[in-house]
A protein has these predicted regions:
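Terminal substrate-recognition subdomain of acyl/acetyltransferases
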Residues: 1-104, 201-202, 206-245
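Residue-level preference for non-acidic, small/hydrophobic
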Residues: 49, 115, 193-196, 223
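Conserved acetyl-CoA-binding loop-helix of GNAT-fold acetyltransferases
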Residues: 185-197
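Active-site catalytic microenvironments for nucleophilic, acid-base chemistry
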Residues: 121, 195, 199-203
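A conserved beta-strand-loop-helix scaffold within acyl/acetyltransferase catalytic domains
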Residues: 57-67, 77-185, 225
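Short, flexible segments with low predicted structural confidence
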Residues: 16-21, 172, 194-195
């Protein structure tokens, strides 16, 4: 007689959203498969689902399941193989005066002021530009799954950029970044990813999960600059050109 072992935790429930206009490709329809992070196993669940293409927002893990479309391709950087190109090395030289550190994720007014300035300059027509300090705190605090904040500060101690990151069992997931919009020469969005890659290299963590690469979307296409880049396709993770067919 076989014995079914007891469940160590409740089964994870998944749901599918209704159709919405795609925020990345004009004329497309977006639907998502999603689940909530609740309980004490958030870090483990986040790690497992990140490996199969899910992303986190607040206490929700989601991935696109859009009808007739597979444009959103999950991508990650294999840290040991990554080598910055000439443009990225120039960005690193420009930012030599910045220091970077990973700290426990805790919302502050200093962060919110920078976040609000970034939204106003870069995304002034988005819902995020209407976020209050309480909304920002919820973004940082809800669904914590071993979540940290990568800070970039100049020599005077001023916060120039920040990235909300989740520590996974095989690396880091870059959740959201924001930075000083009055410093375009620094290319701080790219620099924050480079700094996270270096933190992972020092810690021996193999991957940086960057979310979705979307060909034809200016907001998402930039991720292909980080080479080599792996993408999740039908047969698992593979170099982007092979997996994004």
């Amino acid at each position: 007689m076989s014995v079914i072992p007891p469940l160590h935790r409740p089964l994870q429930q998944f749901f599918r959203s209704g159709p919405m206009p795609c925020p990345y490709l004009t004329g497309r329809v977006e639907r998502k498969l999603f689940t909530r992070l609740v309980g004490t196993d958030n870090g483990e669940i986040n790690s497992q689902l990140s490996r199969v293409g899910f992303r986190r927002s607040h206490d929700i893990l989601y991935r696109p399941v859009c009808p007739g479309c597979s444009a959103c391709v999950p991508v990650r950087v294999p840290v040991a193989a990554f080598q910055p190109g000439r443009t990225m090395r120039r960005i690193q030289r420009v930012n030599q005066d910045l220091s970077f550190r990973l700290i426990p994720a805790e919302a502050t007014m200093e962060q919110f002021r920078l976040f609000a300035a970034y939204q106003d300059a870069r995304h002034n027509d988005s819902d995020m530009n209407r976020m209050t300090p309480g909304d920002y705190a919820a973004m940082v605090d809800e669904g914590q799954a071993d979540t940290m904040l990568l800070e970039a500060r100049d020599e005077g101690g001023r916060l120039r950029g920040a990235m909300l990151v989740d520590r996974l069992d095989d690396g880091y997931s870059a959740v959201y970044s924001f930075y000083d919009p009055d410093q375009p020469r620094r290319s701080l969005g790219t620099q924050l990813v480079l700094a996270l890659i270096e933190q992972s290299r020092l810690q021996g963590r193999p991957y940086i999960y960057l979310g979705y690469w979307i060909e034809g979307s200016r907001k998402m296409e930039y991720k292909a600059k980080f080479q080599p880049l792996e993408a999740l396709g039908r047969d698992g993770w593979a170099p982007l050109a092979q997996a994004a067919d």
